[in-house]
């Protein structure tokens, strides 16, 4: 069921979905900017976390600046009977940031599971591919190397 938000809650969410204020009291600053109090800000965020609308609250690392300069999307051929288990195994790897299942609709593209793997060097992400291949017995995959980042932003909802 879709949530409804008050104008104040939408204003709070507009701020927190971007960058928190660089301050010792970011939630008090948000409260001041939105005409409410710090407890209201914290209560909204706690409620949304408990409901599962907010998955986590934390810093976003720019992986290239942190030294993770090599990444690739790896597309795997996985049947739908094993996709949940294989997806769970892939998600356990610390260098895999995204795992998606998408049904194949193109006759010449049979891949259904997509993983985004990051490494400090090419061999690092190739090792993850090899490990996952051995753990899952998957043999058919395509490595789509990232050549250039054209856009990377977090989704803005409000």
From Swiss-Prot:
Pathway: Porphyrin-containing compound metabolism; protoheme biosynthesis. Its EC number is 4.1.1.111. It is an enzyme of class 4 (lyase). Keywords: Heme biosynthesis, Lyase. Coiled coil: none annotated. GO terms for molecular function: lyase activity. It catalyses: siroheme + 2 H(+) = 12,18-didecarboxysiroheme + 2 CO2. GO terms for biological process: heme biosynthetic process. Pfam families: AsnC_trans_reg2, NirdL-like_HTH. InterPro entries: AhbB-like (IPR053431), AsnC_trans_reg2 (IPR040523), HTH-Siroheme_Decarb (IPR050684), NirdL-like_HTH (IPR053953), Tscrpt_reg_AsnC-like (IPR019888), WH_DNA-bd_sf (IPR036390). Belongs to the Ahb/Nir family. Forms a heterodimer composed of AhbA and AhbB. Involved in siroheme-dependent heme b biosynthesis. Catalyzes the decarboxylation of siroheme into didecarboxysiroheme. This is Siroheme decarboxylase beta subunit. It comes from Oleidesulfovibrio alaskensis (strain ATCC BAA-1058 / DSM 17464 / G20) (Desulfovibrio alaskensis). The gene is ahbB.
């Amino acid at each position: 069921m879709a949530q409804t938000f008050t104008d104040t809650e939408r204003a709070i969410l507009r701020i927190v979905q971007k960058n928190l204020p660089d301050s010792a009291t970011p939630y008090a600053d948000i409260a001041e900017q939105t005409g409410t109090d710090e407890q209201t800000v914290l209560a909204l965020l706690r409620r949304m976390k408990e409901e599962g609308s907010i998955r986590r609250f934390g810093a976003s690392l720019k992986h290239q600046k942190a030294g993770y300069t090599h990444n690739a999307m790896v597309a795997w051929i996985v049947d739908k009977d094993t996709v949940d288990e294989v997806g769970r195994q892939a998600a356990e790897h610390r260098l895999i940031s995204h795992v998606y299942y998408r049904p194949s609709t193109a006759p010449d593209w049979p891949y259904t599971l997509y993983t985004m793997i990051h490494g400090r060097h090419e061999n690092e992400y190739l090792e993850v591919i090899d490990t996952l291949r051995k753990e899952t017995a998957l043999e058919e995959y395509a490595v789509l190397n990232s050549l250039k980042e054209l856009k990377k932003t977090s989704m803005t909802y409000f």
